Amino acid sequence: MLSKKFGLSMIVLGIMSSSAFADSIVEGRTLNVAVSPASPPMLFKSADGKLQGIDLELFSSYCQSRHCKLNITEYAWDGMLGAVASGQADVAFSGISITDKRKKVIDFSEPYYINSFYLVSMANHKITLNNLNELNKYSIGYPRGMAYSDLIKNDLEPKGYYSLSKVKLYPTYNETMADLKNGNLDLAFIEEPVYFTFKNKKKMPIESRYVFKNVDQLGIAFKKGSPVRDDFNLWLKEQGPQKISGIVDSWMK
C-alpha cells in the first residue's frame, strides 16, 4: 500500500521508455523554474541563503537523471504561479497545492504528498475547538495565495463557520507565525510539513487546535500542455513510492 505521503495510485501513463522521453523532451535543455522559497521543508533558504527542500531535491534528481539543467528564478507566491501559467516558466515548485482553479491554467504532476491543514495557536494561548462553530470567536491568518482560502470559501463559509472576509493575509509563513507569536493573531492555518518544521526544527511553542486531515495534495506545476509533466510523472513511477517517501521523510525529521 502506498504511504499517504506519496499519492501516486492514480498514475495512468502510456507505455513509453524513459530514454525516449529523455532524448526527445528534456535532454540537454535548460528548464526555467519559478519558485517562492517560503514553505519549509518543501522549499526554503538555508542560513547562508541557499535554496533547499523536498521539491528541489525531487526535481533536481529528475533533471539529473534526464541530463537537463535548471534556471531558477524567485518570485512572490502569486508571481510564481503567474510565471508558469503564462509560460514564462516551464516549471514551478514550492509546496504547491493542486486545486481545480489552478488546474484551469496549470498542469500538475501526480501528487507526491497527501497533505493536511492545521489550525495552530501558541501553546500558552489555551484554545479548545470542540466544534467548528467556535471558529468565529478567533482571528485566523495565513499567507496569501494559499489553498486555505478554497477550504474556507467552499466548506467553512457556506456552513457559517468562518467568513473569508475575516481572514488576515500575510506575505509568507514567517510573517504569519511572527504575528501569532506576538499575540496579534489567535490561529494560523499551516500545512502539515510546515507545522512540523516550525514545531520540531525551529522549536516554536505552537500547538495544533484542529486538523483538516488529508484534504490537500502537493504537486509540481507545469505550463499547460507541457510534455515535461508526463516525463516527470514517469520518473516518479520509476522511483517508486518507497524512494519518494524516503526523500520526503528525510526532510521531516
UniProtKB/Swiss-Prot annotation:
A Pfam family per the record: SBP_bac_3
UniProt keyword Transport present: yes
Null mutant phenotype: Does not affect growth in vitro but leads to decreased growth rate in macrophages. Decreases survival in host neutrophils. Decreases virulence in a mouse infection model.
Gene Ontology terms, MF aspect: amino acid binding
Keywords: Amino-acid transport, Periplasm, Signal, Transport, Virulence
Subcellular locations according to the entry: Periplasm
Keyword set includes Transport: yes
Binding site for D-alanine: 95, 97, 102, 147, 191
Signal peptide: 1-22
Subunit note: Monomer.
Biological function: Part of the ABC transporter complex dalSTUV, that imports D-alanine into the cytoplasm. Helps protect the organism from oxidative killing by host neutrophils through sequestration of D-alanine, a substrate that is converted to hydrogen peroxide by the host enzyme DAO (D-amino acid oxidase). DalS shuttles D-alanine from the periplasm to the DalTUV complex situated in the inner membrane and through hydrolysis of ATP, D-alanine is transported across the membrane into the cytoplasm. Not required for the metabolism of D-alanine found in the stem peptide of peptidoglycan.
GO BP field: D-alanine transmembrane transport; symbiont-mediated suppression of host innate immune response
GO cellular-component term (any): outer membrane-bounded periplasmic space
Taxonomic source organism: Salmonella typhimurium (strain LT2 / SGSC1412 / ATCC 700720)
SUPFAM superfamilies, per database record: Periplasmic binding protein-like II
Main location: periplasm
Induction section of the entry: Expression is increased when grown in low magnesium minimal medium with an acidic pH, in a manner dependent on response regulator SsrB.
Protein name, per record: ABC transporter D-alanine-binding periplasmic protein
